[in-house]
Amino acid sequence: MQPRVKSVTHSERFLANIGQKRCFNLKIDHIAIAVEDVEKSARDYQEAFDVKDVEFETVESEGVKVAILHLENANIELMEPTNDSSPIKKFLEKRGSGLHHVALETKNIADEVTRMEGCGIQFLGKIRSGSAGTKVTFIHPKSLSGVLTELCSKP
């Protein structure tokens, strides 16, 4: 009788290492939603969730204008493209408005990237500047069951 061989995906390998390799340092920072009109969408979300304050910021390097709504345990980030080469513009053309990514915050993004790469996780580019002075990078959706995931580290 031959031994049974199980194929292990990147996601399974990553999840198997959670308890051993400090993944408990991660927490949900925000859920990002691509929208056509960030001002209108921000008003809709403010009314729906009774959020008083919204922060607006343009991130030139990413080609987006964002509205950040602060909830008790996480944030909602609404993203509108500011130019035709924005990845959000392409996302909207292909899929329409909707969930774009989930962001996880870590205290040390460089260490977390190194750890995750050791688990076989693939990244889309290097660590770079994000909104509100954060450092960010994105995990390839193929590494985590089709979900685009951002890692971020606050100053």
Model-found features: residue ranges?
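N-terminal mitochondrial targeting presequence
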Residues: 1-24
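Vicinal oxygen chelate
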Residues: 6, 67-70, 104, 110-155
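N-terminal beta-strand motif that seeds the catalytic metal site of vicinal oxygen chelate
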Residues: 18-42, 97-106, 155
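A cross-kingdom feature marking solvent-exposed beta-strand/loop segments within repeated
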Residues: 27-29, 41, 48-63, 83-100, ...
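Short, structured motif recognition centered on aromatic/hydrophobic residues
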Residues: 28, 42-45, 69, 76-79, ...
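C-terminal "cap" of GNAT-fold acetyltransferases
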Residues: 59-75
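Short, charged/polar surface micro-motifs in flexible loops or helix N-caps
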Residues: 72-76, 83-85, 109
